[in-house]
């Protein structure tokens, strides 16, 4: 795209920049959310809560399934 095209698209630059920033934020959030080390830490904490009696077996199973699903699925591929 030449100089003329760049000049015509200049008013949309803030929107393109905002969209790029949002894509970067989403990618980083997914990376942290699906990080196996973070999921393992949450599983360990969940086990501690169960052993301390702060949650019951049903709650433990539900939350454990959610965490294991996160490990299996991983971040969405784009």
Swiss-Prot record:
InterPro entries linked: GvpG
Keywords on record: Gas vesicle
Listed GO CC annotations: gas vesicle
Major location (coarse): other
Record's note on what induces expression: Gas vesicle production is induced by growth conditions that promote production of secondary metabolites tiancimycin A and B.
Residues making up the signal peptide according to the UniProt record: none
Compartment list: Gas vesicle
Function comment: Might be a minor component of the gas vesicle involved in nucleating their formation. Gas vesicles are hollow, gas filled proteinaceous nanostructures found in some microorganisms. It is not clear what function gas vesicles perform in soil bacteria.
Note from the entry: This strain probably produces some gas vesicles from the probable gvpO-gvpA-gvpF-gvpG-gvpJ-gvpL-gvpS-gvpK operon; it can be induced to produce more under certain growth conditions.
Similarity comment: family membership: Belongs to the gas vesicle GvpG family.
Protein name: Gas vesicle protein G
Biological source species: Streptomyces sp. (strain CB03234)
Name of the gene encoding the protein in the UniProt record: gvpG
């Amino acid at each position: 795209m030449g100089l003329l095209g760049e000049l015509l698209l200049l008013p949309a630059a803030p929107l393109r920049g905002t969209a790029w920033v949002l894509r970067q934020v989403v990618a980083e959030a997914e990376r942290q959310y699906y990080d196996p080390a973070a999921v393992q830490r949450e599983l360990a904490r969940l086990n501690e809560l169960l052993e301390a009696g702060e949650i019951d077996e049903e709650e433990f199973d539900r939350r454990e399934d959610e965490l294991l699903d996160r490990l299996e699925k991983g971040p969405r591929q784009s």
